């Protein structure tokens, strides 16, 4: 098994790391639920995989804490807390779109840049149904959320708590919906079907458009809707 993993790693280095972004878009290697090794070290590779429910275990308590702080420490009314919470949720939708479009789909020129891009997002396009790489691993989500917390803290002052709670709630919605669009085939609701079709087109037809995952509104605003 170890030799098989090493061989995949070597193949990725030779075949994909130097040419992740193909002329037609992101190349799909497999649509099965299989997980390719990104590192020769099994320990490092473990940190690149995560079960879908892990973000809930980490961040639901964070959301609850900041809602509690909003009401008890900063004495916001429930109405104001909800209003600011929804504001944070709205901010997330913009960040989600911008990150996906300009960071995850940035086309690096250098070899290290291409390796990093493949580990961050290219592997998801190559193996779109890998159930262990559909939500953000804690090694990425915790540092990023910490950075955004301080951003809210320094910019929004006492309003940071409900805004940040809504922002993290938006992130969890994104993670859960992203996983669901790939694996929750039992959900038949029309809104979810439309969201799933939108994301599947991004993977299988037009990776240069359709960057919204939990919401399609910013694709409409910034004219990155599908052309046909």
Describe the role of every protein-language-model region.
Residues 190-197, 203:
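Functionally important transmembrane alpha-helices
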Residues 75-77, 172, 189-191:
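N-terminal start-of-chain detector that recognizes signal peptides
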Residues 168-175:
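Alpha-helical membrane-embedded segments
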Residues 125, 129, 181-185, 204:
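A broad detector of the eukaryotic-type serine/threonine protein kinase catalytic domain
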Residues 1-164, 176, 208-228:
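Non-catalytic, topology-defining segments of multipass membrane proteins
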Residues 181-192, 208:
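Interfacial helix-loop-helix junctions of multi-pass membrane proteins
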């Amino acid at each position: 098994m170890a030799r098989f993993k090493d061989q995949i790693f070597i193949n990725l280095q030779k075949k994909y790391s130097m040419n992740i972004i193909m002329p037609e878009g992101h190349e799909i290697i497999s649509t099965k639920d299989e997980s390719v090794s990104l590192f020769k070290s099994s320990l490092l590779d473990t940190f690149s995989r995560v079960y879908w429910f892990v973000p809930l275990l980490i961040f639901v308590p964070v959301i609850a804490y900041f809602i509690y702080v909003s009401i008890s420490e900063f004495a916001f009314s429930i109405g104001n807390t909800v209003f600011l919470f929804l504001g944070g949720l709205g901010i997330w939708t913009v960040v989600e779109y911008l990150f996906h479009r300009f960071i995850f789909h940035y086309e690096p020129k250098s070899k290290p840049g291409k390796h990093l891009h493949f580990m961050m997002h290219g592997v998801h396009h190559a193996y779109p149904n890998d159930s262990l790489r559909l939500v953000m691993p804690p090694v990425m989500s915790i540092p990023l959320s910490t950075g955004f917390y301080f951003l809210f803290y320094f910019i929004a002052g006492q309003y940071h708590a409900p805004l940040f709670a809504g922002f993290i709630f938006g992130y969890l919605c994104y993670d859960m919906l992203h996983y669901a669009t790939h694996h929750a085939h039992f959900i038949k609701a029309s809104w979810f079907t439309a969201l799933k079709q939108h994301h599947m087109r991004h993977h299988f037809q037009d990776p240069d458009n359709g960057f919204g995952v939990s919401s399609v509104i910013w694709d409409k605003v910034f004219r990155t809707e599908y052309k046909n």
